[in-house]
Amino acid sequence: MASSLVSRPHLTQRPVRAATLASATRPRLAAGALSGRCQAQAAGDLDDAHYMRRCVELARKAAGHTSPNPMVGCVIVRDGRVVGEGFHPKAGQPHAEVFALRDAGNLAENATAYVSLEPCNHYGRTPPCTEALINAKVKEVVVGMTDPNPIVASKGIEKLQGAGISVRVGVEEALCRKLNEAYIHRMLTGKAFATLRATLSMNGIITNQIGKGADQSGGYYSQLMKEYDGVIISSDLAKMSALPLSREAGTNQPLCIIIAQGESSRLHIPSLSQEHASRAIVLADSPVTVEPAGVEVAVFRQIDLESILQLLAQRGLCSVLVDFREAGESFASLLNDFQEDKLVQKVVVEVLPFWLASDGLSNLAFGGSQSFPLKNLELRDVNGSVLLEGYV
């Protein structure tokens, strides 16, 4: 099957110059002054964490644009002052280190480079970042985490060390891993990172609604559509509502993966024009003609979530949101035992401030018969609704 993925638009990156940071005054250490050394070490650790968090902040500027590449940010620091910053804007464009070194210019010599992900050491669509750092004569590189990509995996660190550059790894590692959780998952499993999203009423009824302003610019649902490469929806939702999209400025729209199980021989998607047919792909369990023309159809002998995630990863998608709206029993069956099979990594549930009557409403269950706690559960208020996010 030919890929129907839409090429991502160029994300322009202007040099990002941070405000000059005043050099912190360090106490002079007398010989054997253990407490002074500990204070200096603690101050250095705080600086490292500060600059690495800035790397992550920079990297997030390209959210939704870099896939299948990771998001990466880089900060160049010399004599306690930020002299260069950069982030990777889009697959095929220069990496974060290159932009930061350009920003720093000659001030990169003898500086410390902070980067959220291990610098690459191979030729792809861009030259190795290790060579750029070596040629710039930086004295030290601080890395948030090693790259799980087997092409890179510690080779970049070894290259830098071989050139006499000091390398430290693991600063704010948990934050750096969360930044690229989808990329890491795809590298380690060969499957797209999957998040299940559903909406509940206060009395636990699964509903097709989403909260006030959620799908508008700045709303949580619009943000999700910006961050995820694809969204899996039921054919019933595709027939009844507009396809999910992000309202964020300059964003890329996710690929809509429409599940058509037990459909008739024809599927009409009223909200999709032929001009934008490449925005969607239909996965069916029998041959089906889709309107408008031009929408790709993939026929499976049996549709299951594992096969879908493998297919999407092969096409370069790192992340996908499973949107549980207008979900019939066949769509819900995709999620049977997802926890046991480790097919879904994250759950997002919106609880609306409504008590819904259950008469006549289907309250489908999903996830199989096993109970399990969510990890790292977070909740926040979003326009009167409560949004819960946790990991399986």
Curated annotation (Swiss-Prot):
What name appears for this protein in its UniProt entry? Answer: Riboflavin biosynthesis protein PYRD, chloroplastic
GO molecular function terms attached to this record: diaminohydroxyphosphoribosylaminopyrimidine deaminase activity; zinc ion binding
In this protein, the active site sits at: E97
Q: Which SUPFAM superfamilies match?
A: Cytidine deaminase-like (SSF53927), Dihydrofolate reductase-like (SSF53597)
Can you tell me which residues bind Zn(2+)?
H95, C120, C129
Function, as annotated, reads: Monofunctional pyrimidine deaminase involved in the riboflavin biosynthesis pathway. Also has a reductase domain that lacks catalytically essential substrate-binding residues.
On the tree of life, the source organism's domain of life is Eukaryota
Q: Which Pfam families match?
A: dCMP_cyt_deam_1
Query: In which broad location class does this protein mainly occur, judging by the first location in its UniProt entry?
Result: plastid
Source species, please? Zea mays
Which residue numbers delimit the CMP/dCMP-type deaminase domain? 46-168
Pathway membership, UniProt: Cofactor biosynthesis; riboflavin biosynthesis; 5-amino-6-(D-ribitylamino)uracil from GTP: step 2/4
- Protein keywords: Chloroplast, Hydrolase, Metal-binding, Plastid, Transit peptide, Zinc
Transit peptide location on this chain: 1-26
- Which reactions fall under this protein's catalytic activity? 2,5-diamino-6-hydroxy-4-(5-phosphoribosylamino)-pyrimidine + H2O + H(+) = 5-amino-6-(5-phospho-D-ribosylamino)uracil + NH4(+)
Q: What else is known?
A: Unlike bacteria that have a bifunctional, two-domain RibD enzyme, plants have a monofunctional reductase and a monofunctional deaminase, each having an enzymatically inactive domain.
Q: Where in the cell is it found?
A: Plastid, Chloroplast
Q: How is the cofactor bound?
A: Binds 1 zinc ion.
Does Metal-binding show up as a keyword for this record? Answer: yes
Tell me which Gene Ontology terms the entry assigns under biological process.
riboflavin biosynthetic process
GO cellular component terms, A-Z: chloroplast
Identify the cofactor(s): Zn(2+)
Its Enzyme Commission number? 3.5.4.26
